[in-house]
Amino acid sequence: MRTIGMSDYTVGEDCFTELPTALAECGAKKVAIIGGKRALAAALPGIEAALEGTDVEVLETRVYGTNSTRANIAKVVNSPACQEADVLIACGGGKALDTVKTAAIELKKIVFTVPTICSNCSAATAIAVVYNDDGSLEGYSYPNRPAHIFINPKIIAEAPAEYFWAGVGDALSKQPEVEYATSAGNLEHTAGLGLALAHTCSEPLFTYGVQGLEDVRQNLSSEAVKQIALDIVVNTGYVSNLTNQNDYYYNSSVAHAFYNATCSIPREGTYLHGEVVSLGVLVLFAYTGDTENFERYAAFNKQMGLPVTLEQ
């Protein structure tokens, strides 16, 4: 037996107005809001305005830390407010969202996500990354997918542009990685559906990526920003859930293996996840001998200022 659930999502600068309805559908009366410091500053005003005058009680607003480590996960698990809440509202980037999603496994809580940056697809996925205290990769957890995602393009446009930039780099990997991982064929229905949806992931990046990055650098909420946010969060997130099941894993391959390897060896400088993954995509095409896509993706990386060599 296989049961597939996908996150609901609301997109728009007024997305938080849907929050009371979404909570009511879950029968939720009490919430805890957890996220990064900057993320909470960006998202809380809209969330609080949406809940004003409702019977929903905010039990706690908590800064989670700075990384999705066991220590930070434990702080959420051990919070009396998070234990009492019906829904945990996770705000921030991938590390904040993954912290809350992982904590929710033990707490058995529903999670709503508010991606305040779109650096990856964590807001939609039933997988989370867990790091060691030194920043190296510990492994993965497998929470339930978030029940509802609230995507506010204005918040994303006003966040640091480097995260949007890195998010494009990470999203570039989804289509080629899934295509490579499933290349042996003989896919059952859910995996085949994931592959079909993966084919929708790259073109929006090529179409809207450069303009979207320019708009974010000007803190401008635009159609390009919205389309990139939807692609990074929803398209790639849904693909992740369809291509990652108990009996198979097609969600990533060479590009993320390249990233994981860089987390395990000494290296100079600090690099964002998607920045490294975008170079890993070129490694994938070099490995498979796909010259046409290597050249196309490398040209786009150059347009975006993403790396095309290890030196960068």
Predicted regions and their residues:
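Solvent-exposed alpha-helices and their adjacent loops that cap or buttress functional pockets
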Residues: R2-T3, E25-C26, P80-Q83, A104, ...
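A glycine/threonine-rich phosphate-anchoring loop and its flanking beta-alpha core
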Residues: I105-A198
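Short glycine/serine/threonine-rich phosphate/pyrophosphate-binding segments
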Residues: F16, L40-L44, R70, K95-T102, ...
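C-terminal charged capping/lid subdomain of soluble metabolic enzymes
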Residues: R2, T17-E18, D290-Q312
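Active-site segments that bind and position negatively charged phosphate/pyrophosphate groups
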Residues: E188-A299
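ATP/NTP phosphate-donor binding region
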Residues: M1-A85
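A short, small-residue-rich loop immediately preceding and capping a beta-strand
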Residues: P80-A103, L107-T116
